[in-house]
Design a protein with these regions (language model features):
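Short, conserved micro-motifs enriched in small and acidic residues
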Residues: 38-42, 74-78, 188-189
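N-terminal beta-alpha supersecondary unit
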Residues: 1-69
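Phosphate-handling active-site elements
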Residues: 55-60, 88-98
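Surface "functional belts" at beta-alpha junctions
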Residues: 22-39, 94-188
């Protein structure tokens, strides 16, 4: 099964093709892109075209479209979901929704993973993963309420995503580990 996937839930636009032979081709923006204004309407379709060309596939070879469904910014999600529906409808393909928090968590190699997306207004979208399995459903909360909302001691957890970059000091003061700013772990892939 060959899939085209993309995510526009944060400021960074990411896209990929997963070919039926298991080989993946990604358009992963630089992590610094998370601190810039979003450009999804300009970046998404060229990114999809780029990964499809590098993968050597056309729409006739694709079996489905996967799209990040957040949580995230309203406009970003609207661009991503509308693009997925439009492309899939034109090619008569199914659309597969993917949690953006789960996609972030997939890159975490730690017992406790805390994917965080900046929800603005001093809050984060979060979920908690233990050894890759989601153990706390997605929620929104200010960073100082994460332990209370998850019902867990978060010291030693690894936090990724643009929310972890924005609230690094608060998280690290609570014993949460945050990869360096330039890490690709912070980009939804």
């Amino acid at each position: 099964m060959t899939l085209v996937g993309f995510d526009t839930s944060t400021a960074a636009t990411s896209a990929c093709v997963l070919r039926g032979d298991g080989e993946a081709f990604e358009h992963v923006p630089a992590p610094g892109r998370l601190k810039e204004p979003p450009g999804h309407s300009r970046e998404l379709l060229p990114a999809v075209a780029d990964v499809m060309e590098r993968a050597g596939v056309g729409w006739a070879d694709v079996d489905g479209v996967a799209v990040g469904v957040g949580p995230g910014t309203f406009t970003g999600l609207r661009i991503g979901v509308a693009s997925a529906r439009g492309l899939a409808t034109a090619a008569r393909l199914p659309v597969y929704p993917v949690s953006s928090l789960a996609a972030l968590a997939a890159g975490i190699d730690a017992a406790l993973g805390l994917p965080l997306i900046d929800a603005r207004r001093g809050e984060l979208f979060a979920a908690l993963f233990e050894r890759g399995e989601q153990v706390v459903e997605p929620f929104a909360a200010p960073p100082h309420k994460l332990a209370e909302r998850t019902g867990r001691q978060l010291a030693g957890a690894v936090a990724v995503g643009d929310g972890s970059l924005r609230f690094r000091q608060i998280l690290e003061a609570a014993g949460v580990r945050v990869p360096p700013d330039g890490s690709e772990l912070h980009v939804v892939r």
